[in-house]
UniProtKB/Swiss-Prot annotation:
InterPro entries: NADH_UbQ_OxRdtase_su1/FPO, NADH_UbQ_OxRdtase_su1_CS
Family label: Belongs to the complex I subunit 1 family.
Bilayer-crossing regions: 2-22, 70-90, 100-120, 136-156, 172-192, 222-242, 253-273, 294-314
Oligomeric form and interacting partners: Core subunit of respiratory chain NADH dehydrogenase (Complex I) which is composed of 45 different subunits.
Catalytic activity entry: a ubiquinone + NADH + 5 H(+)(in) = a ubiquinol + NAD(+) + 4 H(+)(out)
Name of the protein described by the UniProt record: NADH-ubiquinone oxidoreductase chain 1
Pfam entry (one): NADHdh
Domain of life: Eukaryota
Lineage, uppermost ranks: Eukaryota, Metazoa, Chordata, Craniata, Vertebrata
Organism: Balaenoptera physalus (Fin whale)
Main location: mitochondrion
GO (cellular component) term, any one: mitochondrial inner membrane
EC number(s) stated in the UniProt entry for this protein: 7.1.1.2
Amino acid sequence: MFMINILTLILPILLAVAFLTLVERKILGYMQFRKGPNIVGPHGLLQPFADAIKLFTKEPLRPATSSTTMFIIAPVLALTLALTMWSPLPMPYPLINMNLGVLFMLAMSSLAVYSILWSGWASNSKYALIGALRAVAQTISYEVTLAIILLSVLLMNGSYTLSTLATTQEQLWLLFPSWPLAMMWFISTLAETNRAPFDLTEGESELVSGFNVEYAAGPFALFFLAEYANIIMMNMLTAILFLGTFHNPHNPELYTANLIIKTLLLTMSFLWIRASYPRFRYDQLMHLLWKNFLPLTLALCMWHISLPIMTASIPPQT
């Protein structure tokens, strides 16, 4: 029975990822005054399936000088971790109801760094290695602010369980009292998922395509799936944290529909940002975090800790 539950979580995620690639190409196409994919199926709707068949039927090439085992393990690990991170998300009922769901997700996203590092190192290519080192430095850096912002939000929530955020936000979305945190959180999620304007890992002019430059066919598709699954997951987490959805136990489908609409709107903004903004320089990327975001998030975190004590109250015990 538990296996069926896992499959009913994983298959829709993979399907959503497949169509997200199509939506991205369509939106970027229309923003650049062209059509986007429109040949395969009606209005190009079957394009993701054509891409999947093409990728998985090609021969997975492997550089002669690469470290075979690690080269193969890295993409599998990337996708496994990306899918595992979905398990504590309440939609409205999580796959595994954890007391420390938020910490679990942070730990999993930290482990995802290893798949990037291994893929870059095992490829035995200077471009892949530099791309991997950039990606790792960026991901680790932005995780710091993500963790501090999460802590600040959880101080208002009074619990590490994600499900209780729906109860906390019945009266008011946390977006309103903590909008600076929400803005920094959104920008940090862009950087965490290596999306434009923070896609420094795949600077075509200098690194060809980043840490996955030596990958082809199936393993490349696994990295691709992991990246897009992370994008949807991060946006869903943003919707749960800051745009709390009202949960009526008698009608849980309403919660799911509401959450999905918010997640889709956030994902659209990811694509809109990609079409609008040029790539940051690497030093600007690091300055933004260490000189701007970190002091601000620390100050706001201290504020969220001290305010309840100052007003002689405690966080809500939900």
